[in-house]
């Protein structure tokens, strides 16, 4: 299935979908813990960007067209200012976000998450953060083949190249 075919699909139900290399994927409905983490991180990033206008923060309502047959909607994403100013607000965002954040759901598989990470980087992402609610950890990816570091509750989440000055203690995400 192509991106164009995906866009023409009627949504007869309350399910959310992504397009994964031509395959329609039903997205699992998030649970409260997932939503709390997403809201917390979105709030922290938005507050930072409001005080430091370096780009724009998006939620999972926004699709990124990563290839002609792949559309993803990361839980949280960030585009640097120069890219954010160029997007057409009426269409999906071409390419990957500069920063993609995925919060793992209980039925997500490691292989499916690794596939998403590879897709983000192939389309131009600079950083991917993968949040693991059960272990209260965050993986920081700067390349598609391996996580650079795994952060735990007392560690600081930072992205100096994209968000100079942003710093968030990992434990803050988990309440």
Q: What are the residue ranges of the model-derived segments?
A:
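Gly/Pro/Ser/Thr-rich low-complexity, intrinsically disordered segments predominantly at protein N-termini
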Residues: 1-175
